[in-house]
């Protein structure tokens, strides 16, 4: 998604490898984000026990999200600060608080600030952090009153999204997140019935709102992918999937930075289809290597800190 956006000059140049628009006019980036939020809801519902309290949940989420984010930010900030002097000249020092909270890119996207010290993480890190805040409440609601939870969620989120009160960055994704949580409780027959209904709903919603269309289509496609998943239940796909899952967050943190740096060395207007394909391969390899390097650096720092401060 970001590769395609970058090499087309954010859609000012012709596409070379991939289209940016899917059926029903759905933007590829929005579709990927929808699947991301659905998977996030499902994975949390699968791994977080019902008896875990909110405080413990927030503590574990913070430990999983912030250390690697701060490390990636420091590395990228250091590079940009030295290699591109003046990159952060317009940022107010107080906006470092947004970086500390993981909300710097979100704040720019939402229009809270014009510029800050954002380097990594992008807007949907902030969005998923807001969803993490809601997770204990949604989990309890689904367990006690699932229909009421869904009714209240839709009654609040759809108007907020349509009115743009959240800059259309959070509210539309709460039902996606909740759908991922709910998916685990659905019987097989229910899933088979729900998939075409959601896709039909996406068709009907197209003239109304693009992101709601994308949310419905994403949920329908997610069910179809889940139904097809047993076909990949083989040793090597499981191994590959497990390895990719280990580095997925690190990939998320570094991939956008890398494609921007790589693309800066090319005249995108004359970049051929072949060279675009080669750049894509280089980009994938660089992202894989950078993600592993970031995780290695985190492990090394943790080991060193544990040796210096064993009581922590």
What positions do the PLM features span?
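Structural signal for the C-terminal ends of transmembrane alpha-helices
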Residues: 44-52, 80-82, 137-143, 181-190, ...
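Alpha-helical transmembrane segments of multi-pass integral membrane proteins
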Residues: 202-303
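Membrane-interface helix-loop-helix regions
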Residues: 16-24, 39, 65-127, 218-226
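Functionally critical transmembrane alpha-helices in membrane proteins and complexes, commonly lining
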Residues: 1-49, 65-73, 248, 292
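Aromatic-anchored segments of alpha-helical transmembrane domains
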Residues: 1-4, 103-107, 153-165, 198-210, ...
